[in-house]
Amino acid sequence: MKDRGMTNTPLSSSELVNTMSHFHRAEIGRMAGWRDRLDRTTNWAITVAAAMLSISLSTPTSHHGVLLFAMLLILLLLWIEARRYRFFDVYRTRVRQFERYYFAQIFSPQSDFAADWLLIFGESLRAPKFLMSQWAAFTRRLRRNYIYMFLILLLAWVLKITTPSLQAEGAERNFVNSLREAVANASLGPLPGWLIVTSLVLFYLVLTGAAFLTRSKDGELGYGEVHV
């Protein structure tokens, strides 16, 4: 006797409804799992930023390089979160396809509204693929969360190099009187201050461009104002 699982026998209406409901529930679970991973990565980044801010600003003996190191750690966590976001986006898209093409059609039917969506959905199950690049995921997470952490770290770094009371003992207890003094305070070991400042300016220009100049209406923002 042939295995029923290998035949092309169509499902009855009740079997189809059960299959759709169970599969939708399963995809919500997978989406929620990856959403939790995203939140945990963001929480790690916030914790790292808060810890480094506390270390750097709590004592004059702490070097401003601590904040530069914090920026590198946040960048690493952002890259990890972008990778996780690509997985999350796959399952989020499947859930939204169910909502947009199946449930929405039940509640508010429209004629010939993506009638072949199940065929496209089936092919995506046979050969799952990422729906966005690593760079696109990177810029999206940067724009929504991480740009604010980088901004806070930058403001703290500027405060650190321009306020002698937050630097090592021996410095005068007043704000720097010129840009040259601030640049000199930004030196890091054998690296001169101008090199550190220039590198940081370029780094933040790239971040700003990635966050706001690469913005597009692709994804859920193309269908409404609500996104995850």
What are these regions (language model features)?
Residues 5-16, 96-133, 222-227:
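Solvent-exposed, non-transmembrane helices and loops of integral membrane proteins
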Residues 151-159, 194-212:
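Hydrophobic core of alpha-helical transmembrane segments in multi-pass integral membrane proteins
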Residues 167-185:
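Membrane-interfacial helical/loop segments at transmembrane boundaries in membrane proteins
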